[in-house]
Amino acid sequence: MLFRCRTVDNMGEVRTMVIPVFLPHAGCTARCIYCHQGYITGIDEKSLRERIDRVLGGRAEPCEVGLFGGNIFGVEPYDLERLFSYFIPYHGIIQGFRLSTKPVPLRDDTVDILKRNGVRLIELGIPTFNDAILAALNRAHTANDLFRAFDRLGGEKFRLALQFMVGLPGETMGDIEETVENMVRLRPEYIRIYPLVVLRNTPLYRLYE
């Protein structure tokens, strides 16, 4: 599934249109217990290149491309280079890329590829800063991994945003307060807040059966 949205600045002025491209579970070596991207985005049987051509082909207006639905940092460098090569025919209209990802694994070659290909903004997912809950969610990273990635990427001049969730199993109000305090301290460009949704055919769903 592909859709279009526009970014709006804090003065309410419409800026560049963002064209999201969904990459279900790309780079996810460990799947979070609540996640089933097939349900969230729909799985298009056509090749990724065909989907990109469909949404960008014939377009004249400038746009930004968002890469969502997977863990970009977990994609092997060769495959990441190949992914960006699919957008080469549209460099005349693409003004940059944004993406969402876990904070790990953060490799030097991955950072280099993202910089060379015009990635401007990275949304780092951190459902909670409680390491016990992160482990129960099968996130395969810790809160300290998020801090390290945020510092490294900020030093590389990427714009940074954060995503967190509420309603997690075992979560307390103290956990939520800790998350808010950490995000205020980190000062991301913006924050996305997601409620936990229990989807069929996920480990989380089976816990509720």
Predicted regions located by residue number:
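N-terminal pre-triad scaffold of radical SAM enzymes
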Residues: 2-41, 57-73, 98-102, 120-121, ...
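Short alpha-helical segments and helix-capping/turn motifs at coil-helix boundaries
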Residues: 4-6, 54, 107-109
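Secondary-structure junction/capping motif
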Residues: 4-6, 172, 202
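Short acidic/His/Gly/Ser-rich catalytic and metal-binding motifs that mark active-site loops
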Residues: 30-32, 199-206
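Conserved non-cysteine loop/helix-boundary elements of the Radical SAM core domain that shape
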Residues: 40-50, 69-190, 204-209
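Short microdomains enriched in Cys/His and/or Lys/Arg
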Residues: 49-59
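Short, ordered loop/turn segments at secondary-structure junctions
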Residues: 196
